[in-house]
């Protein structure tokens, strides 16, 4: 179920959300992150400090004719998957579909996963959200400059266009998160701030996380380890965006997924896509 909001209500909701949860989880639309890097998450795959600079995309409208929003669940979780599609993705989709749970996929199109790109159509048809991640996921390329970043996004959308309506994808996740430090090696200290401003000016929303599965740190963690990581990172949080991966090297994430879903169900969480949890203001 999609939660629609008027622009006025949306701004108020986000203000309250940032005040009530930000101190605990350090998040917003694009600022879901912990104040300390979760144990085992690579620095290059983390958002190490809260980002308090989020503003609504330029497409936000002051028109207040939208229906009143449906109430948000008190406890909700967004399961998000980066770096797919790959040979792991069918197992992830199978687990999600069996459980009746919708997720959000921040996809890549590197040229090495071409044969799996049709899975994007399958995921979208099943009601999962497709969102943008990167064409190459090469930090040294995409973070050379703002122009380099947007060329990567344009290439990604071009490669996705046979499988999904790419011009309708307005959510993205920066490789490494919105306040990553790895980008400084290539584009300087101010690059991420510039990109965040450009993203919102263009009408996109960037999305981070406040729960890390630690499934892409190397060493091929077991399904049990991934499950325990998520339970630990969730802690007492009641509004969670979980970072997982459906890459070729994270097969155990798919194995852990049924137990992860069941744990959240047992603890009273509703499952939302990112666009359901944090919808863009309607025009």
Task: Tell what function each PLM region has.
Residues 137-243, 247-263, 269-270, 276-277, ...:
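Catalytic domains of cell-wall/extracellular-matrix polysaccharide-remodeling enzymes
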Residues 45-169, 279-280:
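Active-site beta->alpha N-cap acidic-glycine motif
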Residues 1-78, 94-103, 162, 210, ...:
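Terminal accessory/targeting
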